[in-house]
């Protein structure tokens, strides 16, 4: 492919923002009645893959659209390489279209298989782990497939550690800032954002109650400095998407989706 898949602006519904997306990983606990422990994420992933057929995907998309979101970032478990094919991809895309949702990102691990899924669904970027690939291998695959990759911070505590994963970044490799994980690591989100500068190509907006753990909470009610992070993103000229992320272990994230969307849209206004 000559260039990256497009990510054109959406026509906003009243009261919505075309730059705000719903991360479907928010529904990690859906298969266990919205109760789970973060340490068992892998088990939830497997159960979600098994539970997500076309009917289940349709219900998920309908519920997301009902909260006013127009865009989604699809968690790998909802469109997993082990079960997806071109035909299924076309079905998933048709369901998204039916509910007025645009897939703007894929949250998962970089591989030829996940890049292919992005092609089927019209997704321009993968945000997550570089997997077993070297930066050179990753850039070559992304260039060939026309889909970008952004490494998401989890253990990293500063920009140097993050940029090392993508060998400083390039046209195809960048950074996805996860404000919640920076809060968990006790890092300064604004400082990391400033240091990464134009290599920040995507953002997961999440808040956590305290450093040292990953207990998510309402935006602006935790320690992740989300308002300051957004202000810094504006200051460096970031114009990409803001994916709202909240993977609660003991509640249904749909209950707070509208509140958090409104808060985020107000910050971006």
What annotation goes with each model-predicted range?
Residues 1-113, 119-125, 160, 261-269:
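N-terminal pre-domain/capping segments
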Residues 12, 95-177, 182-186, 254-255:
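Active-site acidic/histidine proton-transfer and metal-coordination neighborhood
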Residues 18-25, 72-74, 103-107, 126-128, ...:
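Hydrophobic faces of well-ordered beta-strands that scaffold small-molecule active sites
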Residues 25-27, 75-79, 108-110, 131, ...:
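Active-site beta-loop-alpha junctions enriched in small/polar residues
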Residues 37, 42-53, 181-239, 247-255:
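Gly/Pro-rich active-site loop or hairpin
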Residues 57, 61-62, 89-93, 111-115, ...:
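Generic structural signal for well-ordered alpha-helices
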Residues 67-70, 101, 121, 171, ...:
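Structured loop/turn residues at beta-strand edges in well-structured enzyme cores
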Residues 69-82, 169-184, 190:
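Extended hydrophobic secondary-structure segments
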């Amino acid at each position: 492919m000559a260039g990256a898949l497009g990510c054109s602006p959406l026509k906003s519904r009243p009261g919505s923002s075309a730059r705000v997306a719903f991360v479907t990983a928010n529904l990690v606990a859906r298969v266990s009645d919205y109760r789970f422990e973060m340490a068992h994420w892998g088990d939830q992933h497997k159960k979600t893959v098994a539970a997500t057929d076309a009917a289940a995907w349709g219900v998920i998309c309908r519920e997301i659209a009902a909260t006013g979101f127009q865009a989604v970032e699809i968690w790998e478990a909802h469109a997993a390489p082990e079960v997806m094919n071109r035909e299924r991809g076309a079905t998933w895309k048709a369901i998204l279209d039916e509910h007025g949702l645009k897939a703007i990102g894929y949250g998962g691990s970089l591989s030829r298989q996940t890049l292919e899924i992005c092609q089927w669904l019209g997704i321009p970027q993968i945000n997550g782990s570089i997997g077993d690939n070297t930066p050179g291998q990753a850039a070559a695959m992304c260039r060939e497939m026309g889909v970008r990759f952004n490494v998401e911070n989890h253990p990293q505590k500063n920009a140097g550690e993050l940029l090392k994963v993508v060998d400083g970044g390039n046209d195809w490799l960048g950074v996805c800032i996860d404000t919640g994980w920076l809060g968990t690591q006790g890092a300064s989100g604004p400082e990391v954002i400033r240091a990464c500068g134009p290599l920040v190509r995507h953002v997961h907006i999440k808040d956590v109650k305290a450093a040292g753990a990953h207990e998510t909470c309402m935006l602006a009610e935790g320690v992740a400095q989300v308002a300051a992070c957004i202000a810094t993103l504006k200051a460096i000229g970031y114009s990409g998407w803001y994916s709202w992320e909240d993977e609660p272990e003991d509640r249904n994230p749909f209950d707070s989706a509208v509140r958090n969307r409104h808060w985020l849209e107000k910050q971006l206004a």
